[in-house]
C-alpha cells in the first residue's frame, strides 16, 4: 500500500510541477504524514503526504491561509489534492533558528519567538479552535508519554495530579 501511495504522490507531483526528478524523503515525524523534497522550477519545495483518513488537510490549508494573512511566517500551500492528502508547500529549508542566529544572540531569537507568539495569540478567527481543558489534558498526556517516559525516562507521578 505504501509503495502504491508513494507512486501516486510522485505522479501527482509530476503533473503539478512538471518535475520528473523524483522525491527525496525527509526525516519522519510522529504522525502519519510523510515529507519529501523536490523542485519547482529553480526552487526547492516540500511535498507532504498527509493521508486524509488521519489528517484534516482542509483545516491545515485554512490555518496556513489564516496565519499568512496575519503575517505569521508559515509555509505557503502551493497546490493540493485534499481528497488524496497530497500537498505541495513552500520550503523554508534546513536552517534552524540556532544556525541562523549565532552564539550570543539568544535574546534576539527569544524576542523574535515571543513576538510571533503574541501575533498568533492576537489572531481571532473561527478556523482556530478554542483551547479547552480537554485539549490541554490530551496534550499533557502526550508530553507525559513522549517526553517524560520515552525521551528522558522519568516517572510521571509528579504530573498525575495536574
Regions found by a protein language model. Give the residues of each.
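Central P-loop NTPase core of STAND/AAA+ ATPases
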Residues: 154-162
Amino acid at each position: 500500500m505504501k509503495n502504491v501511495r508513494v507512486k501516486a504522490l510522485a505522479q501527482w507531483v509530476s503533473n503539478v510541477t512538471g518535475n520528473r526528478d523524483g522525491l527525496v524523503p525527509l526525516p519522519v515525524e510522529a504522525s502519519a504524514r510523510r515529507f519529501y523534497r523536490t523542485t519547482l522550477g529553480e526552487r526547492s519545495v516540500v511535498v507532504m503526504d498527509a493521508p486524509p483518513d488521519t489528517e484534516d488537510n482542509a483545516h491545515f490549508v485554512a490555518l496556513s491561509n489564516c496565519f499568512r494573512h496575519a503575517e505569521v511566517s508559515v509555509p505557503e500551500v502551493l497546490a493540493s489534492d485534499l481528497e488524496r492528502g497530497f500537498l505541495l508547500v513552500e520550503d523554508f529549508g534546513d536552517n534552524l533558528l540556532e544556525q541562523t542566529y549565532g552564539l550570543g544572540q539568544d535574546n534576539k531569537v527569544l524576542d523574535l519567538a515571543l513576538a510571533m507568539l503574541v501575533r498568533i495569540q492576537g489572531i481571532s478567527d473561527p478556523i482556530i479552535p478554542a483551547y479547552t481543558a480537554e485539549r490541554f489534558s490530551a496534550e499533557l498526556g502526550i508530553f507525559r508519554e513522549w517526553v517524560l517516559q520515552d525521551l528522558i525516562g522519568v516517572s510521571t507521578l509528579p504530573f498525575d495530579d495536574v
